[in-house]
């Protein structure tokens, strides 16, 4: 109530049109311009009589390679990277296919990490956090150490090996799914479905808690 617009910038997806939320004081426009500087959101408000009568909204895509870098900021970044430059640019492999991390349930970069965890830890199943950030790589592009850090630096320093029953795995999947798909937004905790390697399952987002996961 009393808020005309909320400009969001932390969703991983650019939302092309505002969500209009009706409330006791009128309506509130909620926008999201994605993350990592992908878009610049432009919101024009037509104000009449002290109230918003109309609005125009658009997302302007940012092509960073076409924009000249700010000299001072560029120098600051290069100075900070200098001690680690050789290590960050080390080439680890070349990808044969598109590596991305954009799906709500999985992505090819997720699968690469899961395969690596299972191989390194000799595990039948692997779990990985449900993130959707990180750099996408085109087929034939080198995977550098920086790309690896880009994908894993937040939580992967801690990797554990545990024995889990099928019932425990289903409980984990149901709990994460409820954080995402609970019809009450106050119980939704954001993020995405935990990534799973070595196990296939079926998820019904519209089912109730305890009944979303099947076909394991």
Task: List each model region and its residues.
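A generic short-segment signal for beta-strand/edge and adjacent turn/coil regions
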Residues: 8-15, 95-97, 128-132, 168-172
């Amino acid at each position: 109530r009393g808020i005309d617009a909320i400009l969001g910038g932390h969703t991983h997806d650019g939302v092309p049109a505002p969500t209009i939320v009706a409330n006791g004081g009128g309506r509130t426009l909620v926008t999201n311009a994605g993350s990592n500087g992908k878009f610049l959101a432009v919101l024009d408000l037509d104000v009449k009589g002290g109230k918003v009568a109309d609005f125009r909204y658009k997302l302007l895509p940012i092509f960073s390679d076409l924009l000249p870098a700010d000299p001072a900021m560029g120098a600051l970044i290069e100075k900070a990277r200098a001690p680690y430059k050789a290590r960050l640019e080390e080439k680890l492999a070349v990808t044969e296919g598109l590596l991305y991390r954009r799906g709500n349930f999985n992505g090819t970069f997720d699968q690469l990490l899961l395969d690596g965890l299972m191989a390194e830890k000799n595990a039948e199943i692997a779990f990985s956090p449900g993130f959707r950030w990180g750099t996408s790589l085109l087929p034939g592009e080198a995977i550098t150490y920086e790309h690896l850090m880009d994908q894993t630096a937040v939580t992967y320093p801690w990797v554990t090996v545990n024995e889990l029953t099928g019932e425990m795995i289903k409980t984990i999947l149901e709990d994460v799914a409820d954080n995402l798909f609970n019809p009450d937004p106050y119980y939704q905790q954001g993020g995405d479905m935990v990534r799973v390697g070595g196990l296939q399952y079926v998820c019904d987002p519209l089912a109730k808690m305890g009944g979303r996961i099947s076909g394991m």
